[in-house]
Amino acid sequence: MFDNDRPQPEFVDPKIDKHTVVALGNDHIVTPIKMALSDHLKEEGYQVLDFGTYDNTRTHYPMYGKRVAEAVADGRADVGIVMCGTGIGISTAADKNEGIRAAMVGDVVQAKYAKRELNANVLGMGGIVLGRDFIFYIADAFLNEKYQPTEENKKLIKKIDNIAKPNPNQKDNEHFFDEENKKWAEGVYHD
């Protein structure tokens, strides 16, 4: 799995908080990987809220990023994990929600940094780019890392959080994506 010429990452010794609730969301491209991650997290003792999608029917990823982000922002979940093919689109969608610090990562070092230094509350990954086992490894590292507050990173986080502007038309609006869903059904969007 790893290039032997490079330093090997430490394997995480899970110290699971059995009360941690993880919200999951994905697009249709990575549903099997998300389902496997859900099973893995449950086996590790996490409570999982799965916001879909649940099959391989073509869908539009922003709505799933939004659902996960809202669950984290309103306290139904402690953290979120979102995935699409590359991780970029769904992570960006999640990050557009007030109170969310989403980090799209490609390795364990980035995942741990995002949690430890920036108190990221949504982890984004590319299911096709990374693959199932590496996703498990990254998710475990993120979930086991603890935020380590410093005066400097508290100031940075405050600045980041102040960027997000409340959008009353967006929050908890089940019809927010109606126009995009109609266009999707008409074939305007494609993979």
Model-assigned labels for residue ranges:
Residues 2-19, 23-31, 108-191:
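C-terminal binding/interaction regions
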Residues 23-46:
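Glycine-rich phosphate/diphosphate-binding loop of Rossmann-like nucleotide-binding domains
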Residues 44, 97-100, 118:
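Short, structured coil segments at secondary-structure junctions
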Residues 47-58:
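A short beta-strand-loop structural module common to alpha/beta enzyme folds
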Residues 57-66:
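Structural motif
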Residues 68-105:
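Helix-adjacent hinge/juxtasegments
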